C-alpha cells in the first residue's frame, strides 16, 4: 500500500471516528537541572554524547501518559516510550551511561522548552496538529484520542449544545482551548470559557461547580475521573469534537534524532512490545481504555498524520 493510499485511509477513518462517535539500562534520573544552552543549529546528538545526559519534558498530572507519583517519580505511558528512546540513543552513541533528566513542562511552555533547548524530547500527552507542525516535529503516533466533555452526572449535560450560555473550563495551551473558542464563535453559543493552568485545575473547576464542563481528550478525562474521590459522580459525554493523535515532540530539523526515535517506535510496534506497554497503563483495575481502531492502524502503519479536523 502506498503512502498516499495509507494517508487517505487514515483520513477516512479519522473522519468516521470523529463524526460517529529512567530507561532500565540508563542511569537513575536526577532532579531537574539548569536549562541547557539554546541549541538552534547545534547537533543535539553530539551534545548528548558530550554530556552523557538527555533532558526530557514531562508533565505533572497527565495520567496515565506523564505524571509524577506520590514518591515524586515520573511515570506513564509516554515516559516509558521516551525511556526506550533514551536506551536506544545510549546504544547508538556507544555511551557507557546516559542520564535522563526530567524537566517539568506545561501545555503553555512545552514548545518553547523544546525550541530554547531546555528539553530534547517532550514526553507528555501532546497532540500532533497542523499548527504545531509549523513549530516542532513529531515522531510516529503512539496514541489516538478524541475530544469529549467531562461533566457531573447531575448536570444532565449530554453534548455541546447543552453548553449554551454556560461556563466551560479549558486547559491553557491545549487544542481543546482553541477548538472551544472556535465552536463558541461559529455556533454563537455564548459560553463563558475560563482558562485553567493545568488539567487538575480544570477538573477541580467542574468538581467544585465553577464550570459545568471540561472539554479535553477522552483518555485524559478518564484518567482524571479514575483519580477522583467519587469517580461515579462524573461522566464523559457527547460526540467526538475532534480526533487527535499523540506523539513524542522534538525540535524541527533534528533528522538524526528523529530517525532514532522513529526506529525505536517501529521496533516496539513490530515486535508487539507496544501492546505490553499499552496494557500496562490502559488495561488496569484503575483505568480501562480499549485499544481503538485508529490506534491499531497507527501501530500497523506508522505515520505522523496530524489531528482532524
Feature-to-residue mapping (PLM):
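Extended ligand-binding regions for polar small-molecule ligands
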Residues: 27-45, 80-88, 154, 161, ...
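Acidic, polar ligand-binding/catalytic clefts
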Residues: 83, 87, 94-162, 301-309
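A ligand-binding cleft/hinge motif common to bilobed small-molecule-binding domains
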Residues: 108-109, 123-134, 179-186, 207-242, ...
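Ligand-binding clefts/hinges and TM-proximal coupling segments of bilobed small-molecule sensing domains
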Residues: 32-39, 178-194, 232-234, 265-309
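Periplasmic-binding protein-like
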Residues: 60, 143-154, 218-219, 226-265, ...
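Bilobed "Venus flytrap"/periplasmic-binding protein-like clamshell domains
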Residues: 55-64, 74-91, 127, 145-199, ...
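Extracytoplasmic small-molecule ligand-binding "clamshell" domains
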Residues: 29-122
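Bacterial N-terminal signal peptides that target proteins for export
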Residues: 1-11
Amino acid at each position: 500500500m502506498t503512502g498516499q493510499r495509507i494517508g487517505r485511509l487514515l483520513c477516512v477513518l479519522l473522519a468516521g471516528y470523529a463524526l460517529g462517535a529512567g530507561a532500565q539500562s540508563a542511569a537513575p534520573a536526577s532532579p531537574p537541572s539548569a536549562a541547557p544552552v539554546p541549541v538552534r543549529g547545534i547537533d543535539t546528538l553530539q551534545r548528548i554524547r558530550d554530556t552523557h545526559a538527555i533532558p526530557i519534558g514531562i508533565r505533572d498530572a497527565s495520567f496515565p501518559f506523564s505524571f509524577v507519583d506520590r514518591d515524586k517519580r515520573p511515570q506513564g505511558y509516554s515516559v516509558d516510550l521516551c525511556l526506550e528512546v533514551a536506551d536506544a540513543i545510549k546504544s547508538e552513541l556507544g555511551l557507557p551511561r546516559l542520564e535522563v533528566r526530567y524537566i517539568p513542562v506545561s501545555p503553555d511552555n512545552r514548545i518553547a522548552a523544546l525550541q530554547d533547548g531546555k528539553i530534547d524530547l517532550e514526553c507528555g500527552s501532546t497532540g500532533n496538529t497542523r499548527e504545531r507542525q509549523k513549530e516542532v516535529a513529531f515522531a510516529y503516533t503512539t496514541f489516538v484520542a478524541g475530544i469529549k466533555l467531562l461533566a457531573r452526572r447531575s448536570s444532565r449535560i449530554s453534548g455541546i449544545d447543552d453548553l449554551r450560555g454556560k461556563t466551560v473550563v479549558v486547559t491553557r495551551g491545549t487544542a481543546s482551548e482553541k477548538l472551544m473558542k472556535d465552536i463558541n464563535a461559529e455556533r454563537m453559543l455564548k459560553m463563558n470559557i475560563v482558562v485553567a493552568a493545568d488539567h487538575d485545575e480544570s477538573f477541580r473547576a467542574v468538581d467544585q461547580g465553577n464550570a459545568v464542563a471540561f472539554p479535553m481528550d477522552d483518555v485524559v478525562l478518564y484518567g482524571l475521573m479514575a483519580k477522583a474521590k467519587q469517580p461515579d459522580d462524573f461522566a464523559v459525554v457527547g460526540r467526538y469534537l475532534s480526533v487527535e493523535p499523540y506523539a513524542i515532540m522534538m525540535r524541527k530539523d533534528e533528522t538524526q534524532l528523529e530517525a532514532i526515535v522513529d526506529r525505536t517506535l517501529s521496533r516496539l510496534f513490530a515486535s508487539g512490545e507496544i501492546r505490553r506497554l499499552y496494557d500496562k497503563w490502559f488495561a488496569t483495575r484503575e483505568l480501562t481504555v480499549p485499544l481503538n481502531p485508529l490506534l491499531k492502524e497507527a501501530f500497523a502503519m506508522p505515520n505522523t498524520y496530524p489531528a482532524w479536523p
